[in-house]
């Protein structure tokens, strides 16, 4: 049968967006993308998943998300199982420095040698062309969908 998931119900997937001061790299990303965010994570049942420069690539870990450094958007429409499966399948992927430069800075196609944070989150959410999303674009998209989705039918 079908289940109806309504906004405001307990969420198992969230998008966490880093707005803290961070490093010079964080500030450069925010400046280049004209966004308040320099990094993003998908939070699936309390574990943060992303591709991280600090951790060398795709990983999952439990970490604090203090409100002064992170904004969090509930994603009631997200398929937690598909997102988890994407991160499980890409757990050994390296951080995508080359793709970050090619796609985000130069607007070129990815070379497939690594994954950057917003690309990982967008791909895990099943969005088309995940390399086109920086943290700010992903935040805008997810916030829009969250505000305009009253219910989702899942079979």
Give residue ranges: language-model regions.
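Activation targets extended, charge/polar-rich intrinsically disordered C-terminal tails
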Residues: 100-155
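Exposed alpha-helical structural elements
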Residues: 24-27, 82-86, 137-140
């Amino acid at each position: 049968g079908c289940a109806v998931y309504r906004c405001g119900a307990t969420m198992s997937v969230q998008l966490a967006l880093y707005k803290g001061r961070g490093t010079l790299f964080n500030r450069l990303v925010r400046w280049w993308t004209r966004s308040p965010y320099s990094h993003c994570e998908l939070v699936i049942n309390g574990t943060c998943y992303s591709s991280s420069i600090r951790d060398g690539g795709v990983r999952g870990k439990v970490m604090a998300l203090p409100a002064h450094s992170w904004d969090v958007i509930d994603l009631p429409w997200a398929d937690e199982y598909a997102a988890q499966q994407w991160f499980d399948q890409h757990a050994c992927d390296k951080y995508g420095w080359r793709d970050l430069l090619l796609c985000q800075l130069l607007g070129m196609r990815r070379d497939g040698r690594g994954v950057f944070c917003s690309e990982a989150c967008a791909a895990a959410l099943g969005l088309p062309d995940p390399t086109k999303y920086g943290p700010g674009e992903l935040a805008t998209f997810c916030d829009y969908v969250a505000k305009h989705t009253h219910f989702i039918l899942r079979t």
